[in-house]
Amino acid sequence: KNSRKAVFLLQQTWEQRKVNEIFKVTRGQVLAASLTTPKKNRGNIYPVYSSQTKDNGLLGYYSEYLFENAITWTTDGANAGTVNFRPGRFYSTNVNGVLINENGYACYAVSEIINKVAYKYVSKVGNPKLMNNVMAEINIMITPDIDELKQISKLIEAYNQYITLHQ
């Protein structure tokens, strides 16, 4: 069954698509916090993201990376369903799901689109969870125009930098 549904929004046609129609849906790996350093150094140059919200999920730095330019979301705990774009190379712990797309869809704009709806799919029975199979089936409205997504992403990134400067 095709979940595409075209609508007219702004100047472009946007489509309703399932996350797994756009992204490879995967997960990070276990990493002991003791193997990370709080600051970059010669050996540990890649950011490590976890499920925490402190420092935008930054746990520390590590010598290896698993992903590059991808979207993460918190799978378990109080912050389950929190979605972020991670630019550059990074390591993601096992309490994060990861969305991978090599064609430009992994960006700030799409992470915000998903973040606006992901909370609705968090299972709140016991420990809150948003598992890979559930994330994969979430429907989002998205433009197929990568240039439009890049422009929206630039605005979001500039806005985020402005907020960071004034905190």
Enumerate the predicted regions with their spans.
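Conserved sequence/structural motifs within the catalytic ATP-binding
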Residues: S34
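Proline-centric
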Residues: L10-T13, G97-G104, K120-Y121, P128-K150, ...
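A short beta-sheet element
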Residues: S50-N115, S123-N127, M131-M135
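A generic fold-level signal
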Residues: N41-G43, Y65-L66
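Conserved aromatic/hydrophobic "specificity hotspots" at molecular recognition or selectivity sites
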Residues: K1-L31, G43-Y46, Q52, I152-Q167
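Conserved, non-catalytic sequence blocks in retroelement Pol enzymes and Pol-derived host proteins
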Residues: T37-P38
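Short amphipathic alpha-helical signal-transduction/dimerization elements
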Residues: N115-A118, N160
